[in-house]
Each structure stands twice: as C-alpha cells, then as structure tokens.
Swiss-Prot record:
<feature type="compositionally biased region" description="Basic and acidic residues">
    <location>
        <begin position="140"/>
        <end position="158"/>
    </location>
</feature>
<comment type="subunit">
    <text>Associates with the respiratory chain complex III/complex IV supercomplex.</text>
</comment>
<feature type="transmembrane region" description="Helical">
    <location>
        <begin position="69"/>
        <end position="86"/>
    </location>
</feature>
<feature type="region of interest" description="Disordered">
    <location>
        <begin position="129"/>
        <end position="158"/>
    </location>
</feature>
<feature type="domain" description="HIG1">
    <location>
        <begin position="6"/>
        <end position="97"/>
    </location>
</feature>
<keyword id="KW-0472">Membrane</keyword>
<dbReference type="GO" id="GO:0031966">
    <property type="term" value="C:mitochondrial membrane"/>
</dbReference>
<feature type="transmembrane region" description="Helical">
    <location>
        <begin position="33"/>
        <end position="49"/>
    </location>
</feature>
<dbReference type="GO" id="GO:0097250">
    <property type="term" value="P:mitochondrial respirasome assembly"/>
</dbReference>
<keyword id="KW-0496">Mitochondrion</keyword>
<keyword id="KW-1133">Transmembrane helix</keyword>
<comment type="similarity">
    <text>Belongs to the RCF1 family.</text>
</comment>
<comment type="function">
    <text>Cytochrome c oxidase subunit which plays a role in assembly of respiratory supercomplexes.</text>
</comment>
<dbReference type="InterPro" id="IPR050355">
    <property type="entry name" value="RCF1"/>
</dbReference>
<dbReference type="InterPro" id="IPR007667">
    <property type="entry name" value="Hypoxia_induced_domain"/>
</dbReference>
<protein>
    <recommendedName>
        <fullName>Respiratory supercomplex factor 1, mitochondrial</fullName>
    </recommendedName>
</protein>
<keyword id="KW-0812">Transmembrane</keyword>
Length: 176
C-alpha cells in the first residue's frame, strides 16, 4: 500500500487550503463585501433613529427607521445574489473538504493497518524464537552426556517421588 495521498484536482491551488477562522472571515468579507456594508448601514440607521428618539425629533426618527428597512432589504438582496453567484465555488469547497476528510481517514486507517502488521510480525517472530528454543531444548534432551545420566536418574526418580537414597541406589544399580 502506498502512503502517498490520493491525487486531487485541488492540489496546488492556494484557494483550496485548510484555513483558520480568521482567514475564513477575511475571505468571506472579500468575497461578499456588500453584506457587511448592508449590516453597517442598518446599524447606522438604527443608531441615528435612537439618537433622534432621544432628542425628540420624530420626523428624523421615522426617516431613519425607513432607512433601516431599506438597508435590511439591501442586505437581504446582497445575501441572495451572493449565494447564487458563489454557489459553484461553495460546492467545490465542500468537495475539497470532503476529500480532505477522506484523506485523513485513509491515513488513520493505513496507520492502523501498519500497526497491526507490526504487531503480527512481532508475534510471528516471538513464535519462531519460542519454537526454536523448544526445538533446541528437545535436541538437547535427546543427547544425554554421561554426566547427565545421574541427573536424568534423579529427575526420573523425582517423578516417582522417591527419596535421594533410593535414587543413588538406582543409579549404582544401572552402572553395574
């Protein structure tokens, strides 16, 4: 399995990189500058209406409330037109984000598989070492040296749970 990421049509395009929230805010401000302008106009109209109300100027207050309605309408139109204009770009961005998530999940899966392969290899190595040690022990058990004869007699006698004196007698009887 290759650890290279899946090739993408978005690679090399600086527009489609993971971005911070501040970068996203700046990008959205540059993409649709009319929406913040409409929000600012609405806020200014409300501020002026509030000041007129405090001053007691009802004519100016009514005029500013109408200006607020116009500014909100302008903002709403900017949102709708901007949404229609940037629809394809948003779809591309969603596709890019989906591919990024897919790549990350594939990398996690590959790392998990590598870890499983490493553990499996370690387990096989341990089993081979253990089998080799058992084979060496079995091989050593078949070749008994003369000085091991006494030991094997004692071991056999221990299996029968006889005493030391009986084991020595058995050993002497074998040599004669």
């Amino acid at each position: 399995m290759s650890s290279d990421p899946v090739p993408s049509s978005f690679e090399g395009n600086p527009q489609f990189e993971e971005e911070t929230s501040l970068q996203k805010f700046r990008r959205r401000l540059k993409e649709e500058p009319l929406i913040p302008l409409g929000c600012a106009a609405t806020s200014y109209a409300l501020y002026r209406a509030y000041r007129s109300m405090k001053a007691g100027d009802s004519v100016e207050m009514n005029r500013m409330f109408r200006a607020r309605i116009y500014a909100q309408f302008f903002t709403l139109i900017a949102v709708v037109v901007g949404g229609m204009y940037f629809k394809t770009e948003r779809q591309q961005r969603k596709e890019f984000e989906r591919m990024v998530e897919e790549r990350k999940s594939q990398e996690k899966r590959d790392a998990w598989l590598r870890e499983l392969e490493i553990r499996d290899k370690e387990d096989k190595d341990w089993r081979q070492r253990h089998a080799a040690m058992e084979a060496a022990a079995a091989e050593a058990g078949k070749k008994t040296a003369p000085h091991d004869a006494a030991r094997s007699a004692i071991e056999r006698s221990e299996e029968k749970s006889i005493g030391v004196l009986d084991a020595v007698k058995e050993l002497l009887s074998r040599r004669n």
